[in-house]
């Protein structure tokens, strides 16, 4: 072997030995570091620990000093703050950066109160979900949630709208930072969303004549507020306006505690009508509204649902039919029954009467046979006691002939002439498909608030016809004592009534519109409301209208007439 090859073999052998020695020393060093690592970790207080095969479970748990690092509450993981956790922080006196941000949010000046409208249904404008709905206080739109991937979070990042209000908890939040905003300057927004009234405020409603100023500068009287006509719901608007000015009914629904604990069967949707009506009453009488009108959207949606689409927003309806259904549905939803259990509805509007009925022989029969039939028990007069929510007043038939100017003659009739139906003497014939009856009526109990429904529409086989007869009625001092039976007249100390609401139907039966005249008790003035339009009106002008529904208030002993004419 040459000298050169010997040198190369010795060099390769030496290199192998050095690499092996370096590898073994590296392994030894790594093993030493691995043994030292748990000791160093425990000395630093790190949560990292080595899991050993024979270590007991209690020894493997994190030490007490590690707990704050292990249990970290992240805002994007939890949608709602924990109240107990907030209380603990307050007791310990630890105010973190989140609390400081809550008190000093830099985005409060971006809130635009002029676009806020809480009258519509509380659902997300994207997902159409009612769950966890938030209102953007910059643009007024509704969004769901406030988590990392929620519609409200995406909206805040995309459009730089940062202040949101939870429509259910009434809490304010800043997104996307996701912290609660606590500021007293936002109380006016929560009051518009959910107005509240104390007993003292409710008692003074009819004594105040002070105008309120909306956010846009317009002035209005609480309670005399226009209702938005979404499409063809003016018939419902007029009825709701009239009922909102009946003090006992209004006072009952202004205080939510009066009805929120009423128990209803599971799945009962009728109680939704009570809740929505209460919300509408509080909005109509809110002295701190942002605008001088209210939209009855949520109320009407409850009407459509509970009436099974008998009454709709997009189709004109009959005011009397709606009033009759609404009062009975409200009575039933409040837990009332037909005979025994009473509610605020029956306490305010329900009266009673006697109905005398006598069957008539068929008109085509011979006179002798008629005489014989009249002696049978079937043709004897019977009497039943019945309750009523309103009285239907029949108008005389309108003339068919025109005057010398080729115009239809519009007749006039006094109110007391059509009230004679209930004096217990006047008989009227009622026809059915096979039989004819004579009926007369006599009142036995007068309610605190009496509703008159003037029958203007008659249906035949082809169309609905409207009677344009003008009813001449006084605004005050209508005494109904003569329409009571003699034995109950002594029980009724007060039988004098004053008008407080007058609903008018204008135009054709299918294409007409509704408006209402309302008395404001605080000022003693009359106002005309037609959808969003509110104007004052002289009492003398009210009697010239085609009255359709009227609400009269029974006068008390200590009450004086303040209505003027």
UniProtKB/Swiss-Prot annotation:
Reactions that this protein is recorded to catalyse: Thiol-dependent hydrolysis of ester, thioester, amide, peptide and isopeptide bonds formed by the C-terminal Gly of ubiquitin (a 76-residue protein attached to proteins as an intracellular targeting signal)
Quote the Pfam families the UniProt record gives: UCH, zf-UBP
From which residue to which do the UBP-type zinc fingers run? Answer: 103-200
**Residue numbers of Phosphoserine PTMs:** 46, 82
Annotated GO molecular function terms are: hydrolase activity; zinc ion binding
EC numbers for this chain: 3.4.19.12
Q: Which UniProt keywords apply?
A: Cell cycle, Cell division, Hydrolase, Isopeptide bond, Metal-binding, mRNA processing, mRNA splicing, Nucleus, Phosphoprotein, Spliceosome, Ubl conjugation, Ubl conjugation pathway, Zinc, Zinc-finger
CDD domains cross-referenced by the UniProt entry: Peptidase_C19M (cd02669)
Gene3D superfamilies, A to Z: Cysteine proteinases (3.90.70.10), Zinc/RING finger domain, C3HC4 (zinc finger) (3.30.40.10)
Numbered residues of crosslink Glycyl lysine isopeptide (Lys-Gly) (interchain with G-Cter in SUMO2)? 51
The record's subcellular locations are:
Nucleus
Q: Name one GO biological process term.
A: cell division
List residues of the USP domain. 225-555
Q: Which superkingdom does the taxonomy of this entry point to?
A: Eukaryota
Q: Which PROSITE patterns match?
A: USP_3 (PS50235), ZF_UBP (PS50271)
Where does the record place Basic and acidic residues bias? 1-21, 28-39, 85-95
Enzyme class name: hydrolase
Alphabetical GO CC annotations of the entry are:
nucleoplasm; nucleus; spliceosomal complex; U4/U6 x U5 tri-snRNP complex
Region described as Disordered:
1-61, 75-95
- SMART domains named among the record's database cross-references: ZnF_UBP
Q: Which residues bind Zn(2+)?
A: 136, 139, 155, 161
Q: Which InterPro entries match?
A: Papain-like_cys_pep_sf (IPR038765), Peptidase_C19_UCH (IPR001394), Ub_carboxyl-term_hydrolase (IPR050185), USP39 (IPR033809), USP_dom (IPR028889), Znf_RING/FYVE/PHD (IPR013083), Znf_UBP (IPR001607)
- Protein purpose: Deubiquitinating enzyme that plays a role in many cellular processes including cellular antiviral response, epithelial morphogenesis, DNA repair or B-cell development. Plays a role in pre-mRNA splicing as a component of the U4/U6-U5 tri-snRNP, one of the building blocks of the precatalytic spliceosome. Specifically regulates immunoglobulin gene rearrangement in a spliceosome-dependent manner, which involves modulating chromatin interactions at the Igh locus and therefore plays an essential role in B-cell development.
Similarity annotation = Belongs to the peptidase C19 family.
Q: Assembly and partners?
A: The U4/U6-U5 tri-snRNP complex is a building block of the precatalytic spliceosome (spliceosome B complex). Component of the U4/U6-U5 tri-snRNP complex composed of the U4, U6 and U5 snRNAs and at least PRPF3, PRPF4, PRPF6, PRPF8, PRPF31, SNRNP200, TXNL4A, SNRNP40, SNRPB, SNRPD1, SNRPD2, SNRPD3, SNRPE, SNRPF, SNRPG, DDX23, CD2BP2, PPIH, SNU13, EFTUD2, SART1 and USP39, plus LSM2, LSM3, LSM4, LSM5, LSM6, LSM7 and LSM8.
This one is known as Ubiquitin carboxyl-terminal hydrolase 39
- From which source organism is this entry? Homo sapiens (Human)
**Gene giving rise to this polypeptide:** USP39
């Amino acid at each position: 072997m040459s000298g050169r090859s010997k040198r190369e073999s010795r060099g390769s052998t030496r290199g192998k030995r050095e690499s092996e020695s370096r590898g073994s020393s590296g392994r030894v060093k790594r093993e030493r570091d691995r043994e030292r690592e748990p000791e160093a970790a425990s000395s630093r207080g790190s949560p990292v620990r080595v899991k050993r095969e024979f270590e007991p479970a209690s020894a493997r748990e994190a030490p007490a000093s590690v707990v704050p690092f292990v249990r970290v509450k992240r805002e994007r993981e939890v949608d709602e703050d924990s109240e107990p956790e907030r209380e603990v922080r307050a007791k310990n006196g630890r105010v973190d950066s989140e609390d400081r941000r809550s008190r000093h949010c830099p985005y409060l000046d971006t809130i635009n109160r002029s676009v806020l409208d809480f009258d519509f249904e509380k659902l997300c404008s994207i997902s159409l979900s009612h769950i966890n709905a938030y209102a953007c206080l910059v643009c007024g739109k509704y969004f769901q949630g406030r988590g990392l991937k929620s519609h409200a979070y995406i909206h805040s990042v995309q459009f730089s709208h940062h202040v949101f209000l939870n429509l259910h908890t009434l809490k304010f939040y800043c997104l996307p930072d996701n912290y609660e905003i606590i500021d007293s300057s936002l109380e006016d927004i929560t009051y518009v969303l959910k107005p509240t009234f104390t007993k003292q405020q409710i008692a003074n409603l009819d004594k105040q004549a002070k105008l309120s100023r909306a956010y846009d500068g317009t002035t209005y009287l609480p309670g005399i507020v226009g209702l938005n006509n979404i499409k063809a719901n003016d018939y419902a608007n007029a009825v709701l306006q009239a009922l909102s000015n009946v003090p006992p009914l209004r006072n009952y629904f202004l205080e939510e505690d009066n009805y929120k604990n009423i128990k209803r069967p599971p799945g009962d949707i009728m109680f939704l009508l009570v809740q929505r009506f209460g919300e509408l009453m509080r909005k109509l009488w809110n002295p701190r509204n942002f605008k001088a009108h209210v939209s009855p959207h949520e109320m009407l949606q409850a009407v459509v649902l509970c009436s099974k689409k008998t009454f709709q927003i997009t189709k004109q309806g009959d005011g009397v039919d709606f009033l009759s259904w609404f009062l009975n549905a409200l009575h039933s939803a409040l837990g009332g029954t037909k005979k025994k259990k009473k509610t605020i509805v029956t306490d305010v509007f329900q009266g009673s009467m006697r109905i005398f009925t006598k069957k008539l022989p068929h008109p085509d029969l011979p006179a002798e046979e008629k005489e014989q039939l009249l002696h049978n028990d079937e043709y004897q007069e019977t009497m039943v006691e019945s309750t009523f929510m309103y009285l239907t007043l029949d108008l005389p038939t309108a003339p068919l002939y025109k005057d010398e100017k080729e115009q239809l003659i519009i007749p006039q009739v006094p109110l007391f002439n059509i009230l004679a139906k209930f004096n217990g003497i006047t008989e009227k014939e009622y026809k059915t498909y096979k039989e004819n009856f004579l009926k007369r009526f006599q009142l036995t109990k007068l309610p605190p608030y009496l509703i008159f429904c003037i029958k203007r529409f008659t249906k035949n086989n082809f169309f609905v016809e409207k009677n344009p007869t003008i009813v001449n009625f006084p605004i005050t001092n209508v005494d109904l004592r003569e329409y009571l039976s003699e034995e109950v007249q002594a029980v009724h100390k007060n039988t004098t009534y004053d008008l407080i609401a007058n609903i008018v139907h204008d135009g054709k039966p299918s294409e007409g519109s509704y408006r209402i005249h309302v008395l404001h008790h605080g000022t003693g003035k009359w106002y005309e409301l037609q959808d969003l339009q509110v104007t004052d009106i002289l009492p003398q002008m009210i009697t010239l209208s085609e009255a359709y529904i009227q609400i009269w208030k029974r006068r008390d002993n200590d009450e004086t007439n303040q209505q003027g004419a």
